[in-house]
Amino acid sequence: MVKTMKCKFCDKKSYIKLKSPKMYLCKEHFVEYFENKVKKSIDKYKMLSKDEKILVAVSGGKDGHAAAWVLKKLGYNIELFHINLGIEGFSEESLKAVKELAEKLEVPLHVVNLKDITGKTMEDIRGKKCSICGTTKRYLMNKFGYENGFDVIVTGHNLDDEVSFILNNLFNWNIRYLAKHEPVLPAHDKFLKKVKIFFEIEEELILKYAEAEEIPYTTVECKYAERAITLKHRAYLNELEKERPGIKYQFLSGYMKNRHLFKVEEEDFQFRECEVCGMTSAGKICSFCRVWKLYKKKKENRN
């Protein structure tokens, strides 16, 4: 007969077994534990304040949705931002989940359609789409946030994402990325402050929180996602986590303590305004306008 484990803090049946710290928790005490963990992380890194106007990026998946949910419960002033990328099947399901989330949270939802801005969808892009998609999402959410008076952008990147990212950049010795990897990116010119409230939270815990709170999200994945290397990294890290519970967090903590070792001296760099859209750019034309060839449209409109 299998023994039913009880919650550490009450007599209810356990909902989850935490590996680090080792304890069983019922659904109610797990939700309390999770939300306190997020609050501590926000306070630790001075991520957010209650008077800030916060734009939460939601793609339809559990991480962004859980981020919005917990911030609303903690009393922050949030609104949701979603980009319809025009990917058959995926975009429809994502938008449906996002609308349901906004309705449950009773917060404003802002939806931007990629085709309305570029005249194209991600389906129209040939070859590898992921890097262009990343550039597109970062640009559009920052531009929308800047033009609509938001103070900060929150994304749902979690501990597993961060550790995998750091590991990948260590393998490739991308020093510049390693030097700038932070839970909070400060505002600069037209770049809004960006925050990762799940920087220290495992993906597994986010999933269990989403299930416990019955947060609406879609499990449909993008058919173009390039995840081969990332999945291998995660599988390796998950095996290590089984053998040494807490190793992911220890790895991230070690990186945060020693990230100054990756700092490199850089020449004084002056950002400028993109000649096409006017947003902050490293060059004459920003990466978004360049990849979507919007500079060509501007020339055509002049003629």
From Swiss-Prot:
One example GO MF annotation: ATP binding
Source species taxonomy: Archaea, Methanobacteriati, Methanobacteriota, Methanomada group, Methanococci
Sequence positions that bind ATP: 57, 83, 137, 156
Binding site for Zn(2+) 1: 7, 10, 26, 29
Keyword Nucleus: no
Pathway where it operates: tRNA modification
Assigned EC number: 2.8.1.-
PROSITE patterns tied to this protein: UPF0021
Residues the entry annotates as binding [4Fe-4S] cluster: 130, 133, 222
A single cellular component GO annotation: cytosolic tRNA wobble base thiouridylase complex
Function: Catalyzes the ATP-dependent 2-thiolation of 5-methyluridine residue at position 54 in the T loop of tRNAs, leading to 5-methyl-2-thiouridine (m(5)s(2)U or s(2)T). This modification allows thermal stabilization of tRNAs in thermophilic microorganisms, and is required for cell growth at high temperatures.
UniProt xrefs under InterPro entries: Ncs6/Tuc1/Ctu1, Rhodanese-like_dom, Rossmann-like_a/b/a_fold, TilS/TtcA_N, tRNA_thiolation_TtcA_Ctu1, TtuA-like_LIM_N, UPF0021_CS
Stated name of the protein: tRNA-5-methyluridine(54) 2-sulfurtransferase
Residues where Zn(2+) 2 binds: 274, 277, 286, 289
Note: In TtuA from T.thermophilus, the sulfur inserted into the nucleoside comes from the C-terminal thiocarboxylate of TtuB, but there is no TtuB ortholog in M.jannaschii. The thiolation reaction likely consists of two steps: a first activation step by ATP to form an adenylated intermediate of the target base of tRNA, and a second nucleophilic substitution step of the sulfur (S) atom supplied by the hydrosulfide attached to the Fe-S cluster.
Keywords, sorted A to Z: 4Fe-4S, ATP-binding, Iron, Iron-sulfur, Magnesium, Metal-binding, Nucleotide-binding, RNA-binding, Transferase, tRNA processing, tRNA-binding, Zinc
GO biological process, one term: tRNA wobble position uridine thiolation
Protein origin, superkingdom: Archaea
Main EC class the enzyme belongs to: transferase
